[in-house]
From Swiss-Prot:
Organism whose genome encodes this protein: Mycolicibacterium paratuberculosis (strain ATCC BAA-968 / K-10) (Mycobacterium paratuberculosis)
InterPro entries reported for this sequence: CinA (IPR050101), CinA-like_C (IPR036653), CinA_C (IPR008136), Competence-induced_CinA (IPR008135), MoaB/Mog-like_dom_sf (IPR036425), MoaB/Mog_dom (IPR001453)
Gene field: cinA
Listed SUPFAM superfamilies: CinA-like (SSF142433), Molybdenum cofactor biosynthesis proteins (SSF53218)
Gene3D superfamilies: CinA-like, MoaB/Mog-like domain
Pfam (any one): MoCF_biosynth
Protein name: CinA-like protein
Length: 434
């Protein structure tokens, strides 16, 4: 594929470098760049030391990137040095931007006015001390374009070869600034050589990665123009994400590849537009009322269902019934059934789902009971054994159902997370067939 404009990302912060805080900015910025057709050369992470930050900038410049994007290090404290380092790297002086200083002062006033505990800080003398402490954030490289702050930290865009976009660390501040930053003349000039790509994502569940690899090898020979498609795959908790980038002239090749995947793996290919299973389930539950009954997942499925805005329209409620007594008292599971089959069994999962439908007057229910480990497994039911029951039908009436047992790999956290994913897909399939 032709070489496009290239960019590098520098994520700063000792807390990110040491793993205390997970980097959310690098992947997010990378996606935005790829959407624009900009090639991503490197993502680097470094601590707060100025010479380490400058070393990353010089490394990326030596790699010939057209644009560098940094995140973090824009606060008022002594270890927030990114702007100063970028100014030195770009050969520009730091100057006080009076307009930015006034904007920061107004933001501080509003923040303090909303917090009664620090009303005394509005005293003129006290406030001026605070304003002086934040003046550092109004120091910008000469000739840079300033981005209005979302918090108190403004971003800056410094023209040059490479151009540098400097953004704050908190994602809630960085993300709203991105559109303005990338539309600045300096940024647009830097990425002027980008290639226009289309990017598509397919999602599959229940297909081994080796199965997809075999189909892609077949496509290499069967699909004209396959070599013009840039394909990356990622396996996440039993789901495969396949992202394909291509120039518009290769649209026919992508369409033929998608048809081949649909023909060979139609049962596993559940999304051709990148929608997640959670999005699809939310749409399928419109006009319904769902309840959950969970043991080993301890409410994770209910949390996942209610993570979508508007979920109160269809989620009735859920029960976490860890003990056998709770299963009997809260869900009406017959203790004799548990005694005969064990708490981790398909009959108990069915009874839990039926109990949830009845208790919440729901027409849809999902039950999960299993052994997440690390203890509790037996030869007959090892760690990772999980029973599911999904039911669709009015409470008290015979329901359409899908009840099954699966052996899921991984540690306790993996098994619990995979269990919710399996449950979501069983729910999706049953509702799709409704």
């Amino acid at each position: 594929m032709p070489v496009s404009a290239r960019a590098g990302i520098v994520v700063t912060g000792t807390e990110v470098l040491t793993g205390r805080v997970q980097d959310a900015n690098g992947p997010w910025i990378a996606d935005r760049l790829l959407e624009l057709g900009v090639e991503l050369a490197h993502i680097t992470i470094c601590g707060d030391r100025p010479h380490d930050i400058e070393a990353q900038l010089r490394f990326l410049a030596d790699q010939g990137v057209d644009l560098i994007v940094t995140s973090g290090g824009l606060g008022p404290t002594a270890d927030d040095m990114t702007v100063e380092v970028v100014a030195r790297f770009c050969g520009r002086e730091l100057v006080l931007d009076a307009e930015v200083e006034e904007k920061i002062a107004n933001i501080l006033k509003k923040l303090m006015a909303r917090n009664p505990a620090i009303q005394s800080a509005l005293d003129p003398g006290t406030f001026e001390s605070l304003r002086a402490a934040n003046r550092k954030q109004a120091m910008v490289p000469a000739g840079a374009q300033v981005l209005d702050p979302v918090g108190t930290a403004p971003g800056v865009v410094v023209p040059g070869k490479p151009a540098v976009i400097v953004l704050p660390g908190p994602p809630r501040e960085l993300q709203p600034m991105w559109h303005t930053a990338i539309q600045t003349p300096a940024a647009q000039q830097a990425i002027a050589g980008r290639t226009v790509y289309r990017q598509e994502m397919l999602r599959m569940f229940g297909l081994p990665e080796s199965g997809l690899a075999e189909t892609l090898r077949e496509a290499e020979a069967a699909v004209p123009g396959f070599g013009q498609l840039e394909i990356t795959t990622c396996l996440r908790r039993g789901e495969i994400e396949m992202v394909t980038r291509y120039e518009p002239t290769a649209a026919t090749a992508y369409a033929q590849l998608t048809k081949l995947l649909r023909d060979k793996h139609g049962d596993q290919l559940y999304s051709e537009d990148g929608s997640r299973v959670d999005d699809l389930v939310a749409r399928l539950l419109a006009g319904r009322r769902i309840a959950t009954a969970e043991s080993c997942t301890a409410g994770l499925l209910a949390a996942r269902l209610t993570d979508r805005p508007g979920s109160s329209d269809y989620v009735a409620g859920g029960v976490v019934a860890y003990s056998n007594e709770a299963k009997a008292e809260l869900l009406g599971v017959d203790p004799a059934l548990i005694e005969a089959h064990g708490a981790v069994s398909e009959p108990v999962a069915q009874a839990m789902a039926a109990g949830a439908r009845q208790r919440f007057a729901a027409d849809t229910a999902v039950a999960i009971t299993g052994i997440a480990g690390p203890g509790g497994g037996t030869e007959e039911k090892p760690v990772g054994t999980v029973c599911f029951s999904v039911q669709v039908g009015p409470p008290g009436a015979t329901a359409r159902s899908d009840t099954r047992t699966m052996r899921l790999p991984g540690n306790r956290s993996d098994i619990r997370e995979r269990s919710t994913t399996v449950a979501m897909h069983l729910l999706r399939r049953l509702l799709t067939d409704a």
